[in-house]
């Protein structure tokens, strides 16, 4: 049985209603940091799911979420899920994920890699413009539990903070005070550092392991089997993966048929960047001239003779 939330758990919730009510908040959030309203309009997309709730999280002191690692806060009701996507933004796949979500009037949390956002800022902006939550997944997705980061906390902090600065620059505005560690490895010293920064750490309840899969059917089967077992949860997928992007429309359809509901999580306050790392990012941009992109994302064969 999941423990009951303590008083410090998320408190402000927006419900799915048919329309606005007197005094309802109407302000929209800054890019990457949506502001919850007092209600959620019904989905106007044919067959779309629509959001069930928006949950605002007070990240003071760096709470942890996701029962795979953190047991204290259980804010989801039966058959509720939070959709999270790691490792974007990425061409083709991230836009396909965005379309599937838009077709269902849903919002998700994107834990983006800072370096990827510098390569594809236009896609990061699309994620923010659609009202999704943007959060950091480090600068270059290094496992911070391994050396050199495990033995050099300053280098590990740089990997965290450069990711935050890069996302902030890519979307030209604030992002949420959420963070997910690469490989879900949580060094205690870095958890303490995030707590000092008032950044919440997200693990998962349902890990799709979609990075091991090449077919959309495999992704769907993995998620649904685990969801049926647990009944609810924070779901980890990757918008970097083509199979996931291809699977999402059918997966959302199965969610709806199964009576599952999607919750959008937002942070009460955006994360602030640190000037030291903003300056490091600016200096790196001047020196790198984007030469760090992988060959496959730069050079494409578009024609060759038949043999």
Where are these regions (language model features)?
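Compositionally biased, proline/threonine/alanine/serine-rich low-complexity intrinsically disordered stretches
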Residues: 1-41, 285-307
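Active-site beta->alpha N-cap acidic-glycine motif
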Residues: 40-149, 159-168, 175-176, 250, ...
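C-terminal domain-boundary segment and adjacent tail
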Residues: 72-75, 118, 244-307
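Active-site-proximal beta-strand/loop segments in catalytic clefts of secreted hydrolases
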Residues: 84-88, 111-115, 138-139, 180-184, ...
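Alpha-helical scaffold elements lining the catalytic groove of polysaccharide deacetylases
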Residues: 93, 140-171, 185-231, 244
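Residue-level detector of anion-binding/catalytic polar loops
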Residues: 107, 133, 200, 207, ...
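Short low-complexity, flexible loop/linker segments enriched in glycine and/or proline
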Residues: 124-127, 149-152, 217-220, 277-281
